[in-house]
């Protein structure tokens, strides 16, 4: 039956006939002629309305003929019987069901209305060739029915394409959002690391902080001492070596004596124990305020007051005056000069001979012996020889400066030959010991000045405390 329906459709296209008014009659014997065919059909179709036989064809599969019949307008195809008897057997009638076309057209119109499209838009979308103008309305409906199948296939493809495009866009957006979140998390983690670990730049910056030069004044007033710089041991020793090579040795300058120095000096002679107690209290106060000190600086200060066979001059008034100057500067409660100079104030205030010792510490030994020996040893020096008698009246008290005597003492080598071996060796040994003590004390003073001049009062009190025992 399907083959007969396809044959009817193809035949109507070839004959340009309306498929809705065409009939296909099959089962006609091969030897049946045109008159006999019309006579048989006349008995069946004439009551329904006019008809005409358009053409005949032979079917090999059925080994029979088939006739294409067109009925007139107004004939109801449903009233035509599907089978009727004829010559050679049963003849069958095949036609298009009108209800099938009506339902299809109805569905097509509803679809176009929902999409807000027309049949022309469908043709343009599918790029179909414009068909020839139909002769009747039924003819155009048939053409559009064929185009609908193509349209539905295209619509399905478009829907699939749009769905895939939307899915790809959503996936791309999800990936972009994930990347943005990852970048934000990395940035926040990096910011936290920077806040927690400032790095080596902050440590190096703290090591470059300058020390406050007025910090020792704050210590004298009762404040906290200056904090030590945070540096490596290797870098500190290297910088100190460079300073020792580049900076020349600074000579001590005596402090200016205040008007009330005599009274304070006398007070210091009368009450040495009270001054020692005050100096010890200040020493403990300074040590408490200077907890963060460098070990190297502490060792340098410990080496400064080296105990040796040092003999102070016999003129006690000058020594007492120097003690008075030191105690007076402590009682005033302030530092008039740098801490380095204050540590040596007890010597430089009234004893230029000691200053001369320090200046010519690298000079000849005889010069140091002349200025540092006690007056009780003068008889030993007078035994030098015939030239010693000339030097005796020229010698002055240890407190008087004798800068012009150094050349004569150095140039009296030939005259000093008659000196006895005992006194020469003893004087030479004493000179070496005094020179070593002076050199050690000068090295301690230089290290103390370069390390920041810390704890000058401790050195002063210790040196002053050693005077009675040394004398």
Swiss-Prot record:
Residues 256-269 have a biased composition (Low complexity). InterPro entries: PNM8A_C, PNMA, PNMA_N. Transmembrane segments: none annotated. Residues 238-247 have a biased composition (Basic residues). Residues 188-300, 321-471 are annotated as: Disordered. It comes from the Eukaryota. This is Paraneoplastic antigen-like protein 8A. Belongs to the PNMA family. It holds the Pfam family PNM8A. Residues 270-287 have a biased composition (Basic and acidic residues).
């Amino acid at each position: 039956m399907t083959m007969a329906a396809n044959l009817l459709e193809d035949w109507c296209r070839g004959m340009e006939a309306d498929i809705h008014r065409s009939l296909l009659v099959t089962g006609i014997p091969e030897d049946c002629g045109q008159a006999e065919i019309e006579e048989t059909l006349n008995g069946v179709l004439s009551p329904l309305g006019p008809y005409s036989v358009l053409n005949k064809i032979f079917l090999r599969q059925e080994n029979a003929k088939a006739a294409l019949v067109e009925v007139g307008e107004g004939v109801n195809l449903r009233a035509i019987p599907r089978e009727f008897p004829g010559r050679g057997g049963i003849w069958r009638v095949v036609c298009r069901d009108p209800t099938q076309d009506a339902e299809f057209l109805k569905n097509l119109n509803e679809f176009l209305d929902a999409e807000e499209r027309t049949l022309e838009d469908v043709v343009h979308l599918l790029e179909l060739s414009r068909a020839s103008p139909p002769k009747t309305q039924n003819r155009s409906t048939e053409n559009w029915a064929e185009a609908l199948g193509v349209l539905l296939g295209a619509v399905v493809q478009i829907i699939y394409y749009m769905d895939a495009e939307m899915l790809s866009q959503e996936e791309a957006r999800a990936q972009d959002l994930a990347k943005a979140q990852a970048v934000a998390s990395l940035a926040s983690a990096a910011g936290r690391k920077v806040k927690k670990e400032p790095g080596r730049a902050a440590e190096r910056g703290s090591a470059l902080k300058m020390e406050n030069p007025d910090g020792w004044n704050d210590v004298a007033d009762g404040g906290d001492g200056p904090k030590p710089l945070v540096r490596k041991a290797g870098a500190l020793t290297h910088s100190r070596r460079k300073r020792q090579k580049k900076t020349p040795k600074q000579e001590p300058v005596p402090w200016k004596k205040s008007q009330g120095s005599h009274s304070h000096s006398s007070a210091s002679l009368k009450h040495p124990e009270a001054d020692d107690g005050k100096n010890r209290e200040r020493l403990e106060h300074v040590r408490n305020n200077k907890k963060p000190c460098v070990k190297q600086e502490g060792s340098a200060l410990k080496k400064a007051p080296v105990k040796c066979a040092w003999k102070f001059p016999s003129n006690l008034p000058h020594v007492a005056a120097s003690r008075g100057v030191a105690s007076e500067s402590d009682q005033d409660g302030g530092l008039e000069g740098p801490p380095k100079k204050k540590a040596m104030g007890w010597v430089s205030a009234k004893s230029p001979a000691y200053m001369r010792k320090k200046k010519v510490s690298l000079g000849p030994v005889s010069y140091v012996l002349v200025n540092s020996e006690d007056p009780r040893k003068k008889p030993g020096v007078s035994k030098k020889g015939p030239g010693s008698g000339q030097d005796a009246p020229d010698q002055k008290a240890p407190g008087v400066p004798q800068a012009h005597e150094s050349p004569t003492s150095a140039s009296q080598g030939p005259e000093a030959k008659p000196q006895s071996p005992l006194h020469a060796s003893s004087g030479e040994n004493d000179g070496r010991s005094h020179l070593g003590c002076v050199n050690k004390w000068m090295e301690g003073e230089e290290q103390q000045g370069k390390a920041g001049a810390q704890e000058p009062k401790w050195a002063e009190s210790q040196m002053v405390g050693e005077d009675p025992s040394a004398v």
